[in-house]
Amino acid sequence: MTQNIDQNEVNKFAEIADNWWDPTGDFKPLHVINPLRANYIDQKLSVEGLKVLDVGCGGGLLAEALDAKGAQVTAIDVTEANIGVAELHAKKMQVNIDYRLITAEELVAKEREAFDVVACLEVIEHVPDQESLSKHVLIFLYQMVKCFFLL
């Protein structure tokens, strides 16, 4: 399987990965909008106890917010530095999130795991084959649940 990865995007995020949890840094806009996004998802679905997949999790901002609302979160990203930052922050905050360095396509091929909710926020514009990402994200869903894409 060809990896659906834009190496320039991976390199860009690797360079600034240490800034994920700085609310005044490169990711300030995400820090501002993240509580709104997490609350919106929770209001629509009541995520407590649900299995949530966060595709393109970055440093774990959304993953931790949904974990705090009681979701069982698996979060994936293709940038090793992002996963490292996310894991360190989760350990510091004593939260239990399953972070994985893998693409959505690879996760489907390896595990065929199902999730109640899939969040793919600010990700699709960073991949070369957007249709492939969309198709593979939808494979994870149980019937009659929601998927959130945000460009």
Indicate residue ranges for each PLM-predicted region.
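N-terminal, positively charged/glycine-rich alpha-helical extensions of SAM-dependent methyltransferases
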Residues: M1-W21
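Soluble or luminal CAZymes and related metallo-dependent hydrolases
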Residues: I5, I33, R37, D129
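Flexible, glycine- and charge-enriched loops at secondary-structure boundaries
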Residues: D6, F27, H31, I76
